[in-house]
Amino acid sequence: LFLLTSCTQQDAPQNQPKELLYVWLHDVGFEDPNFLAVINADSESENYGELVDTVPVFDTVGMAHHTPIFLPSSGLIYANDFHNSHTYIYETNNPLKPKLSKSFGKIKEYSFPHSYSELPNGNIISTFQTKGGINTVGGLVEFSPDGRYLRSSDAEIEGESIFLRPYGIVLVPKLNRIITTNYDMHETDNSFHIQIWDMKTLEQLHTIKLPKNEDMIIDQNPFEGRLLSDGETILFQTFSCGLYMLNSLDQNMPKISYVHHFAEGPFCSLPVRLGNYWIQTVASDMGGCNGGV
């Protein structure tokens, strides 16, 4: 995943880029350790687009996967190696020369971390797909900015056998809500639900099944969501290429409604919201994502 950051005048020496792009990567063949790449993202720089530095983890070979979408205010980047159920934290006090400051594996039996997001208080909230074993339901874990465990909350619903694997995170500070999607990275089964949590207490408030559309299998595996400009409404897509709207989050019965079907293709991956526009990646018939809508 990618993080874009700006360097202040104090941070950036003369002739150094004013904007940087951090990219968390693994190599194509999974033969070398994951690494964080620093790229010149200053469009006015003569070296725009060039690689500035790379910082490997010097650890086991794995799968570099998610980071926060935006650089946290602490300047600490959480980055996960999903295959190894591991989290790395980079500090960016010197934006041009990040340093690996900490790493950890399982937390209180929670394993396979996926997404990270900065809460309004500066702490980091993360989805963990499982707890206690690969065929279990995970939950939310909250960390201090520097990676200390603070608290957690299970996604499993007592007495109900709903398949859940917490995946993406959307924060709605205006309404004191956290929304999580559910998609199993190990692909043991399909999920059809999103969950809504109280941001202050991490109490699980709602588990809502996506509405089924006749003749279209697009309600499988809620994937990534984005908060809209009103600060209250969420659009999210499914891995099976459906687009849905979630609103009335502060009501007793939040509402999910079908919006659009992107493609007949095998899957739809990460979206980007730019102002009032939704840009959606769509897979080719051969597997990789090679287009957008």
Give a label for each model feature:
Residues N15-P17, L71-S74, E118-N121, V172-L175, ...:
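Residue-level detector of Asp-centered blade-edge/turn motifs that repeat once per structural unit
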Residues D27-F30, H83-H86, T130-I134, D184-T188, ...:
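Short glycine/acidic-enriched loop and turn motifs that connect beta-strands
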Residues V38-N47, I89-P98, P145-R148, I196-L205, ...:
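Short loop/turn segments immediately following beta-strands, especially the blade-tip
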Residues N47-V57, K97-K106, L150-I157, Q204-K212, ...:
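Beta-propeller fold detector
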Residues Y48-E118:
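Blade-loop segments of beta-propeller domains
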Residues V61-I69, K108-Y116, I162-V170, D219-R226, ...:
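Repeated scaffold domains used in trafficking and secretory/extracellular systems
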Residues N94-P173, N182-D184, L210:
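Asp-box/WD-like beta-propeller blade repeats and closely related beta-sheet repeat scaffolds
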Residues V172-V293:
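Beta-propeller domains
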